[in-house]
């Protein structure tokens, strides 16, 4: 285990909760930071706080409500439908979200004496979001180091994992049932298996079904 301190960018969803469990295995001290960016489902923040409390992780919520003013999107405005037109990004994409989240997380981490930042971005199942790409994360890592003259390391443990592989990692961390029943991924604000209809729920369910099927096949041999 690395005895250094890490900050996890934390939403209370499947991916960031998996990253929180991962970070607790990897680092001597872990904190979680959640951003209030005007998301229409405020329950996300409550879920993040509840999970952090249960895991004994210090949790901070930072106000980034200006993001909803700058970049209208389906995650902050109920009058914008969750959809994806051919050749376009989904309406759930928030311009600059990960750029701002990671930049503010870096400032927060430096003030806490932490070099390590953990985020659940993933290029394998990223819905075309440009700020989930590995090249962006590597570029931002260099920029943050130059901007603050500080040796940050941004960790992306899910970057090259499919959703099924993310569930496998959760299982290996001993957290599958916890993540399955206590996290909030659903765009409609429903904990655990969610609404079953939005893109986030569909991706989550497809990955879980695939992993459980593969696990059952291995165990039956």
Curated annotation (Swiss-Prot):
Keyword terms: ATP-binding, Ligase, Metal-binding, Nucleotide-binding, Queuosine biosynthesis, Zinc
Known pathway: Purine metabolism; 7-cyano-7-deazaguanine biosynthesis
Binding site for ATP: 10-20
Binding positions for Zn(2+) per the UniProt entry: 186, 195, 198, 201
GO biological process, one term: queuosine biosynthetic process
CDD domains: QueC-like (cd01995)
Pfam hit, one: QueC
Gene3D superfamilies reported for this sequence: HUPs
Chain segments annotated as transmembrane: none
Family, similarity comment: Belongs to the QueC family.
Summary of the function given for this chain in its UniProt record: Catalyzes the ATP-dependent conversion of 7-carboxy-7-deazaguanine (CDG) to 7-cyano-7-deazaguanine (preQ(0)).
Name of the featured protein: 7-cyano-7-deazaguanine synthase
């Amino acid at each position: 285990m690395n005895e250094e301190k890490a900050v996890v960018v934390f939403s209370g969803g499947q991916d960031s909760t998996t990253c929180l469990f991962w970070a607790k295995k990897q680092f001597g001290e872990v904190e979680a930071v959640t951003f209030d960016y005007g998301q229409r489902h405020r329950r996300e923040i409550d879920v993040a706080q509840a999970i952090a409390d249960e895991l004994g992780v210090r949790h901070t919520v930072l106000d980034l409500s200006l993001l909803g003013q700058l970049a209208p999107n389906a995650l902050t405005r109920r009058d914008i439908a969750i959809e994806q037109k051919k050749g376009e990004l989904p309406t759930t994409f928030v311009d600059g979200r990960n750029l701002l989240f990671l930049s503010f997380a870096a400032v927060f981490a430096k003030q806490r004496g932490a070099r390590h930042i953990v985020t659940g971005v993933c290029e394998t199942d990223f819905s075309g979001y440009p700020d989930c790409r590995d090249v962006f994360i590597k570029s931002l890592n260099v920029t943050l180091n130059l901007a603050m003259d500080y040796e940050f390391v941004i960790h992306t443990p899910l970057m090259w994992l499919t959703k099924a592989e993310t569930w496998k990692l959760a299982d290996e961390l001993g957290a599958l049932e916890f993540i399955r029943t206590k996290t909030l991924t659903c765009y409609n604000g429903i904990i655990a298996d969610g609404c079953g209809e939005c893109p986030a729920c569909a991706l989550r369910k497809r990955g879980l079904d695939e992993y459980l099927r593969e696990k059952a096949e291995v165990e039956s041999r």
